[in-house]
């Protein structure tokens, strides 16, 4: 979309959102006057915003669901399959379109994700002013593939802003550890030097309050799809790497569930999507005492 048209598109959708009757159907929203300064110079090309049905008469702040697509996708397309669940749970969908760089290059990831996380955090902070809708302080995040990588790293950088994460089919993880069997784990492999990227050290006390659900297809096991730099730390397939991340979460004492969908490959199936949304919906309920196992049942692998 040309940038000029993008400016017009966002102006139109925000005008619709802040009108007395909030449209239940979203429209593509791109970098506009109020948003462009927040995402200028970043790989974020546009932001799709869709309020849930009934948002115009809502008496409580809306729960934001930040939806993060994978390589080559778009926020609007990724959100289409989430609309029904967003209406069911009352989520304000926020789905950026991101022009990701080479995710197989750790140096690119180490440069790119801190920029994306800062920009998205700033955007979420400004969302009430941009839309006229009040939002809850912490957000839910659902990401697939490259988006799942960004989703869990967002929580590692800004656990204060995240209620729960559903990460589907990530190709590589930043383990919530400063070291492993082979020594120190610097970003993007671990959080040893997170202060150099986030401006603060890894906050384990806040991070272990974030509820995590990690999903992966049981047939998503093609090692050729993944960069080799993570092999010695997390394994050679998406399933092994999901297991490694889950093990690191358990070692930390964090709230985490791993679910392996036996017949699924890399695509997001309806079963995976519904399970992820059900988890995120349950995360909105009052929390049990810290350390209580989450309700979602992991699938044996």
What are these regions (language model features)?
Residues 8-20:
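Bacterial N-terminal signal peptides
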Residues 98-100, 170, 261-263:
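Active-site loop/turn elements of alpha/beta-hydrolase fold enzymes
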Residues 22-64, 139-142, 146-149, 158-160, ...:
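A domain-start/cap signature at the N-terminus of enzymes
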Residues 66-68, 168, 216, 261:
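Alpha/beta-hydrolase
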Residues 108-132:
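Alpha/beta-hydrolase active-site loop
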């Amino acid at each position: 979309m040309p940038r000029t048209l993008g400016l017009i598109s966002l102006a139109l959708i925000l005008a619709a959102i802040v009108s007395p009757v909030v449209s239940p159907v979203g429209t593509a929203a791109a970098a506009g006057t109020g948003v462009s300064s927040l995402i200028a110079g970043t790989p974020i090309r546009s932001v799709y915003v869709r309020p849930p049905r009934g948002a115009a008469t809502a008496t409580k702040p809306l729960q934001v669901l930040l939806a993060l697509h994978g390589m080559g996708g778009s926020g609007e397309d990724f959100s289409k399959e989430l609309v029904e669940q967003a209406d069911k749970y009352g989520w304000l969908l926020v789905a950026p379109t991101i022009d990701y760089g080479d995710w197989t290059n750790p140096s690119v990831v180490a440069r790119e994700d801190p920029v994306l996380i800062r920009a998205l955090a700033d955007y979420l902070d400004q969302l009430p002013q941009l839309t006229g809708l009040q939002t809850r302080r912490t957000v839910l995040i659902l990401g697939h593939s490259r988006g799942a990588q960004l989703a869990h790293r967002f929580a590692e950088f800004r656990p204060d802003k995240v209620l729960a994460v559903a990460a589907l089919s990530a190709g590589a993880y930043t383990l919530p550890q400063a070291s492993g069997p082979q020594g120190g784990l610097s970003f993007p492999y671990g959080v040893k030097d997170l202060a150099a990227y986030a401006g603060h050290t890894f906050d384990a006390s806040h991070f272990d309050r974030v509820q995590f659900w990690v999903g992966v297809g049981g047939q998503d096991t093609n090692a050729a799809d993944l960069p080799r730099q993570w092999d010695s730390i997390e394994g050679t397939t998406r399933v092994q790497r999901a297991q490694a991340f889950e093990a690191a979460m358990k070692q930390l004492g964090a709230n985490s569930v791993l679910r392996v969908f036996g017949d699924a490959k890399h695509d997001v199936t309806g079963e995976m999507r519904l399970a992820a949304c059900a988890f995120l919906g349950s995360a909105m309920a009052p929390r049990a005492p810290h350390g209580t196992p989450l309700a979602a049942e992991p699938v044996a692998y």
